[in-house]
Amino acid sequence: MSEELENKFLDLCHKYPTGLTQQMIEVSLGHKMEEIVKVINNLIKQGRLMLIQNSDETTSYKEVNPEDQAKFRGLGVEDFLIYQLIEASSNTGAWTRELKNSSGYQQVQITKILKTLESRKLIKSVKSIQSGRKKVYMLYNMEPSREITGGQLYSDQSYDHQYIQIMKMHIKTFVDNKGAVDLADIITYLRKVAEEATSQSLGPEDIQALVNTVIYDGDIEEMRDTRMGAMLGRRSGILYKPTKTPIPVNNFCNMPCGNCPVFDICSDNGLVSPKRCVYFKQYLEQDDESLDF
């Protein structure tokens, strides 16, 4: 009888892949609830059934994919709830504090559950660049969002300066050789360069950030002219061209005085003075080669 009821229950799971509610089970199966509970508990122990906690505090049940059943085998109700909360966080991940607030579990219990889920490769921890590289948790096969990883310009959640300098050099050279290009041209060219060099594909946001940096460096200029864009067959009217006039350098800004927040109250005989300034002393003690004139 239990095997027959189990098969009926699984058939019902196939019919409702998003989850079975308690009411649906009672109406569809028509057996005593004690018998159904035994079947449910047995399927959960086997890793064939997942328990889902709904927002209205009711419980649903969902069949686990055959390839994942070994990973879910033996998990308890608390494990499933934390897994469900992490699943709901999608590619942005969930903080341990969020898991604690949503579940009501103690931190020690959550830490233990997270270790269990990680060891079974159901979830993974990812360092976020947004909040001091704190860990967030997401499903094991989930690709973290750009807000978490920083995109392709970051390597192991750290700014990849060497890679960025190389890409900036390619942008400058490309614009110098072409004379005038739009962002689509740069994206096409830079994606090809990036894939050949690292087998990685840069996103439009990454490339736009690189282009902006090259502009700030004074190596290229942005032209906003819809007429010029129309002549060259560009829709946006925003083009990038080589910089004709180098941006002048103000060497006063290289000195501590140029960026000093207390410059206005500094005087020879005052409490703040060049004689007492630690930063000015360090600046004067530099070698000539290290001074940027």
Curated annotation (Swiss-Prot):
Keywords: DNA-directed RNA polymerase, Nucleus, Transcription. Pfam families: RNA_pol_Rpc34. GO terms for biological process: transcription by RNA polymerase III. GO terms for cellular component: RNA polymerase III complex. It is found in: Nucleus. DNA-dependent RNA polymerase catalyzes the transcription of DNA into RNA using the four ribonucleoside triphosphates as substrates. Specific peripheric component of RNA polymerase III which synthesizes small RNAs, such as 5S rRNA and tRNAs. May direct RNA Pol III binding to the TFIIIB-DNA complex. This is DNA-directed RNA polymerase III subunit rpc6.
